[in-house]
A protein has these predicted regions:
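Bacterial N-terminal signal peptides
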Residues: 10-22
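Sequence signature of WD/YWTD-type beta-propeller architectures
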Residues: 2-4, 25-178
Length: 178
């Protein structure tokens, strides 16, 4: 004679154990999320990338020209042209930021001030970068306003001063400390 108590225990265990095992399946990592894809392959350093809002271009800093310059890389599908050097000055350029419409790049250059000034390079026009700020002091990390009429940046008037965040209107050059 089979005792119902023992049978019922095994029956419950037979149902519960597979259910627990089902919820204990190890998660598989998604290769798209965990495997970065190398998109530059220079013998020197490539860093500080900024990607356009439409994802078609990237501007980055590289020392492959002998000093730190800005370079443009096309990110579209298929075979792309070689990366294009954007700045050609012997001073270091860095901290690029592509405008929301993808037509201009704000960046910091040490060409007129060893502490850094902000310049804008029009990607659609001939000619070199135009200075936005060329004053004594340190200006860094430019960021475009959404409407592209102003830049926000950090500045320090002297090596002992505390950094502050400022805004500069591109038309007229009015600076406002925030």
């Amino acid at each position: 004679m089979i005792r119902l108590g023992k049978f019922r225990g095994w029956a419950i265990l037979a149902i519960v154990f597979p259910a627990i095992s089902f919820f204990n399946i190890p998660a598989q990592a998604s290769p798209a999320l965990n495997a970065p894809i190398q998109i530059t392959s220079n013998p020197g350093e490539d860093f500080a990338p900024t990607v356009s809002a439409d994802g078609k271009i990237m501007v980055y800093v590289s020392d492959k020209s002998g000093n730190l310059d800005l370079w443009l890389k096309n990110l579209g599908p298929g075979i792309q042209p070689p990366d294009q050097r954007l700045t050609f000055h012997s001073a270091e350029d860095g901290s690029p930021e592509i405008s929301p419409d993808g037509k201009r790049v704000a960046f910091v250059s040490h060409r007129s001030d060893p502490r850094g000034d902000i310049y804008i390079l029009d990607l659609m026009a001939e000619g070199g970068p135009k200075p936005v700020i060329q004053k004594p002091g340190e200006e860094r990390d430019p960021v475009w306003s959404p409407d592209q009429t102003a830049l926000y940046f950090s500045s320090r008037s002297s090596s002992t001063a505390q950094p502050v965040i400022e805004k500069i209107e591109l038309e007229g050059g009015k600076r406002t400390e925030l």
